[in-house]
Regions:
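HhH-family (HhH-GPD) DNA N-glycosylase catalytic core used in base-excision repair
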Residues: 1-146
Length: 146
């Protein structure tokens, strides 16, 4: 399935996303992004923090989605995805030696890198830092089989 235009994406019913393993909430977010495509396109001329703020005005787009999107699309060096389970644990493991951390601890730990926190996280990930796992990997449910 190719999404060549926002119009094409808007026309896809949510159950079609199930075949791709995309659950309803994410399908709604994709539809929202397609509906506001021209608004999103205008964020390309904004700096990173302003673009993140603009994206978070859209329904279904929170701090995590805005940070990851702008970190990639704008190269925003400080777009830290707060709320991500793995990122906070990667930071805790790599920089403090503790296998688990909280978002607040991550923000405190990365404060010395203000302005470059996304870069630091990406460097840690690329360097192979990964917090230890304590449970079996969660089984992904194929929503198409429901």
């Amino acid at each position: 399935m190719l999404f060549r235009s926002p119009e094409r994406l808007k026309a896809i019913p949510s159950w079609e996303f199930h075949r791709l393993g995309i659950e309803e909430q994410r399908a709604r977010t994709l539809h929202t992004a397609a509906r506001y495509a021209s608004y999103i396109d205008r964020t390309r001329d904004l700096d990173g923090p302003s673009a993140r703020e603009a994206l978070m005005r859209l329904p279904g787009i929170g701090i995590w989605t805005a940070a990851v999107t702008v970190g990639v699309s704008h190269g925003d060096p400080d777009a830290l995805p707060v709320g991500d389970f793995h990122v906070k644990n990667t930071v805790a493991w790599a920089l403090t030696g503790r296998p688990r951390g909280t978002d607040e601890e991550m923000l405190t730990t990365l404060a010395v890198y203000a302005g470059h926190r996304w870069r630091v996280v990406r460097l840690l990930e690329r360097a192979g830092f990964m917090a230890p796992r304590f449970a079996p990997k969660r089984r992904l449910l194929d929503v198409a089989s429901l």
